Amino acid sequence: MSGRIEYIAGPVVKADLPGAKLYELVFVGEIKLFGEVVRVQGDKAFIQVYEDTTGLRPGEPVVRSGEPLSAWLGPTIIGKIYDGVQRPLKNIEEISKSPFIARGIGYDQAPPLDLKAEFDFKPAVKPGEEVSPGDVLGSVKETELMTHYILYPPLPENAPGVVEWVADGKYKVDDVIARIKTKRGIVEVKMWHKWPVRRPRPFREKLPPVEPLITGVRTIDTMFPIAKGGAAAVPGPFGSGKTVTIRTLSMFAQSRFIIPVLCGERGNEAADALHGLLKLKDPTTGRSLLERTTIIVNTSNMPVAAREASVYMGTTLGEYFRDQGYDVLVLADSTSRWAEAMREVALRIGEMPSEEGYPAYLPTRLAEFYERAGRVVLIGSKERVGSLTIAASVSPPGGDFTEPVTSNTLRFIGAFWPLSPRLAYSRHYPAIDWLAAFSRYVDTVEVWWSKNISTEWRRIRDTLQSLLVKEAELQEIVRILGTEALSEYEKHVLNVAFMIREGFLKQDAFNPVDTPSSPIKQFLLMKAIYAYYEEGMKAIEAGVPAAVLRELETVKRLPRLRMEVTNDVAKEELTKFIESLVSEIRSVLAARKQ
């Protein structure tokens, strides 16, 4: 089960390791650094090391673990901050006695779960009841916001059977809480189990994503929605607002459980994001957001190989909570850093480079990641539904969206929210470019909006989007010939598009009135702008100049509404405003006819 190092090249080690398996977890050197076998040639194994290899030398031992890199899944996950291989950073700090992570800290010193923690276990099954892998055996109240359901692990060795023993009471995480009698023998179930991070957890069938994931961000929810179980990408250059967008989603997205994965970002930026997340409160209960969050941190100065582990680790944790029947959101920031790590390791082990040096399997790895999102019927004897939504930022060098990571990501996602430096530098946030963004979920979530908010939602949304496209065309004419060359109708279109941009798309992420924006507030803000457009068209046809309409008091108030009307009074206040807006435009029209 052991071998010797032959050579070291940065994060990659070649070892003589008979019997090594692909993606097996190994411990490298005298200090037992975490590593993963990424290539096997005969008895030779190429290992990507998840810790700094400085000081390693040929001849040191490499010890096989006999199992793949796996996530530890069970109570005490919630609220933890992990590194890329699921070691709690708080424990590492206590052991290292330094701001920097000491090498060779194993799971024995920093276990991912507190196996000695005690919880009140409440069984959901009785002795004699038939159960299948994936069934809920009981639950523990881990935090005020989250009930942690204990599953009969869907491991390959577990088979359907009959509950032989289960009882309520106080148990440690490592205690046996049930015994299942199967054809293969007795299975003793503990509160926790391991799952290989590269293996997707099983489900019965995938369902169409029909319910929108409400994020409180108007540009996303209304114009380019994402459904629960969908996948989205947020590409953008430096300074365009990717991290703030991800932070806003982590705070206000209506998911029961959220997993931010800070993958390869700058250390000070990650620290700032962490401090922000730790201070955030759940908007519905006022309790700490950490009570329904697990954070994975892997900064740019940490070993590059661990970036890959952190992405898979976050997705596996997300699938685990999905299997409990929750709606889960995984936020990866950013997949470009993961791809760069993949490129470095691939080149170190001598694989043939593809476009821009990335390995030929880059699209495959991206597909494996994004395809783990989905709204699914869970396995087990009772039908339950859970969802895993993935939103990942992409950091293309120089904002070039044609580079391999961004262009390949486009193939596997349903919503694309590109951030524009032009909008960011003009202080328009979120800086999502409405001319380049798209969503494949508009048709599927339309039913939800029609049923819960208004049947007019799709028609008004499509009209506003077409006006933004029309504005871009008219701006070309204005740049060349000036506004004098435009008709009154075209001037009105420009005025309405300005209202859409300033009064709807623009949103202050740090203003409690403006963010989050409830679905009804979003719709009525949109309807108010649509009313200005529709009634204004009738007035212009009767000869009223667009400039006169623009100077009306209610129209002047349109861009400020988002900052003045709170979610709890939005329905009453905005309905009254729309009535007064229509009334004022019609009075101008009536005066014109006289």
Swiss-Prot record:
GO-annotated cellular components: plasma membrane
Key words, A-Z: ATP synthesis, ATP-binding, Cell membrane, Hydrogen ion transport, Ion transport, Membrane, Nucleotide-binding, Translocase, Transport
Intracellular or extracellular location(s): Cell membrane
GO aspect biological process, one term: proton motive force-driven plasma membrane ATP synthesis
Recorded catalytic activity of this chain's protein: ATP + H2O + 4 H(+)(in) = ADP + phosphate + 5 H(+)(out)
Membrane protein topology class: Peripheral membrane protein
One MF annotation (Gene Ontology) recorded for this entry: ATP binding
EC id: 7.1.2.2
Amino-acid positions noted as binding ATP in the UniProt annotation, renumbered to this chain: G236, P237, F238, G239, S240, G241, K242, T243
UniProt function note: Component of the A-type ATP synthase that produces ATP from ADP in the presence of a proton gradient across the membrane. The A chain is the catalytic subunit.
Subunit relationships: Has multiple subunits with at least A(3), B(3), C, D, E, F, H, I and proteolipid K(x).
Family, similarity comment: Belongs to the ATPase alpha/beta chains family.
Protein name: A-type ATP synthase subunit A
Source organism (scientific name): Pyrobaculum neutrophilum (strain DSM 2338 / JCM 9278 / NBRC 100436 / V24Sta)
Chain's gene name: atpA
